[in-house]
């Protein structure tokens, strides 16, 4: 178990400590459950009313909440960012593997860097290159000529197909498959003809990929994930997709082939993105967004019907089905109004 002094926390977060610099913490906890030895944080001012009852050893807050803290206070610019840094420093998550398991199958010509760990029943095929401090969990498969950079970690049962390239400091969760064939077929008189997927997948540095996500290899060019991208669980990323630097994609999202997503984009959960389109840098798509055409300007985009009671939703759905009929009736009314405007009144009989 890692233990840190509050002085060390101040160094890690860049914050200003008000209190005992020698006090010790060993874990992070939510404000309402924190006890002695815990560090907690306040990022939303509406919860400041609970500060007085908090029992944590130290609370990370902004300047405006410091006087409300009943114990040691660590004043930081962004308490949530500070929480992330402290959680990393105190992280006690076990490693997927230690050393090289006797049951691991490793090709004779595979190149392993210093301090590599490979778990039980993992398979490392011919021509694979693993950088320094790489960790391969139990049951992983690393295909021929794949390359993994320094400090990259794979949890159990990750599959990396042949010639896939993964950068340094990446983290891939269990069940993810990278480099399977893209969905490429030609149709000749009703018969499907498979198109060999001759490209690969290139993943940059500091990329994190959640559990059971699939990233397909390119048909001719590569599928590309740039540096600092974070990808949640259970996404489908099709062949030749390109995801730009620093983007974040939430769970359940499906991206069709050859779409290009810009830098610093945020894609909400369960979104569906059409193929062969481009999304500009800095675009945010809210959850369950359906993107059918390119987005050329940064900003926030939404689609779909927000949650309603079932009764309200049924009424809304009924209205949606009547839109075409209502449109026709409206056009007919507009035409009648136009015709009535063109008819001039006959005032000759009034004299």
Curated annotation (Swiss-Prot):
Biological pathway: Bacterial outer membrane biogenesis; LPS lipid A biosynthesis
Superkingdom to which the source organism belongs: Bacteria
Enzyme class at the top of the EC tree: transferase
Keywords for this protein: Acyltransferase, Lipid A biosynthesis, Lipid biosynthesis, Lipid metabolism, Repeat, Transferase
InterPro entries: Hexapep, Hexapep_transf_CS, LpxD, Trimer_LpxA-like_sf, UDP_GlcNAc_AcTrfase_non-rep
Disulfide bonds: none
Keyword Heme part of the UniProt annotation: no
EC number(s) stated in the UniProt entry for this protein: 2.3.1.191
CDD domains listed in its UniProt record: LbH_LpxD
Catalytic activity entry: a UDP-3-O-[(3R)-3-hydroxyacyl]-alpha-D-glucosamine + a (3R)-hydroxyacyl-[ACP] = a UDP-2-N,3-O-bis[(3R)-3-hydroxyacyl]-alpha-D-glucosamine + holo-[ACP] + H(+)
GO molecular function: N-acyltransferase activity
Gene Ontology biological process terms from the UniProt entry: lipid A biosynthetic process
GO cellular component: a single term: membrane
Active site: 239
Keyword Lipid biosynthesis: yes
Quaternary structure (record): Homotrimer.
Function: Catalyzes the N-acylation of UDP-3-O-acylglucosamine using 3-hydroxyacyl-ACP as the acyl donor. Is involved in the biosynthesis of lipid A, a phosphorylated glycolipid that anchors the lipopolysaccharide to the outer membrane of the cell.
HAMAP family cross-referenced by the UniProt entry: LpxD
UniProt family annotation: Belongs to the transferase hexapeptide repeat family. LpxD subfamily.
Annotated protein name in UniProt: UDP-3-O-acylglucosamine N-acyltransferase
Taxonomic lineage of the native organism: Bacteria, Pseudomonadati, Pseudomonadota, Gammaproteobacteria, Vibrionales
């Amino acid at each position: 178990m890692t233990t840190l002094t509050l002085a060390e926390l101040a160094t890690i977060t860049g914050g200003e400590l008000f209190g005992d610099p020698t006090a010790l913490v060993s874990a992070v906890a939510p404000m309402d459950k924190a006890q002695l030895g815990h560090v907690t944080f306040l990022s939303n001012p509406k919860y400041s009313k609970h500060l007085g009852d908090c029992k944590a050893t130290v609370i990370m807050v902004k300047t405006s909440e410091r006087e409300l803290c009943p114990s040691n206070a660590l004043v930081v610019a962004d308490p949530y960012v500070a929480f992330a840094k402290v959680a990393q420093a105190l992280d006690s998550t076990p490693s997927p593997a230690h050393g090289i398991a006797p049951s691991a199958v490793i090709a004779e010509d595979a190149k392993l860097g210093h301090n590599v760990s490979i778990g039980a029943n993992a398979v490392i095929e011919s021509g694979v290159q693993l950088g320094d401090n790489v960790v391969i969990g139990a049951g992983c498969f690393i295909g021929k000529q794949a390359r993994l950079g320094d400090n990259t970690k794979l949890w159990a049962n990750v599959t990396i197909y042949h010639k896939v390239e993964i950068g340094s400091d990446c983290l891939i969760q269990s069940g993810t498959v990278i480099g399977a064939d893209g969905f490429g077929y030609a149709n000749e008189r009703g018969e499907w003809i498979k198109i060999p997927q001759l490209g690969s997948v290139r993943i940059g540095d500091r990329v994190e990929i959640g559990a059971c996500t699939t990233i397909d290899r390119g048909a001719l060019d590569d599928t590309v994930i740039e540096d600092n991208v974070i990808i949640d669980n259970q996404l489908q990323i099709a062949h030749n997709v390109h995801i730009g630097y620093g983007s974040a994609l939430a769970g359940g999202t499906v991206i069709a082939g050859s779409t290009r997503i810009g830098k610093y984009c945020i894609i909400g959960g369960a979104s569906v993105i059409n193929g062969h389109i481009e999304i500009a840098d800095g675009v945010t798509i809210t959850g369950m967004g359906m993107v059918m055409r390119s987005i050329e300007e940064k900003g926030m985009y939404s689609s779909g019907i927000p949650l309603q009671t079932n009764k309200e939703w049924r009424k809304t759905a009924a209205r949606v089905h009547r839109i075409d009929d209502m449109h026709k009736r409206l056009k007919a009314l507009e035409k009648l109004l136009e015709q009535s405007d063109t008819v001039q009144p006959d005032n000759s009989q009034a004299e």
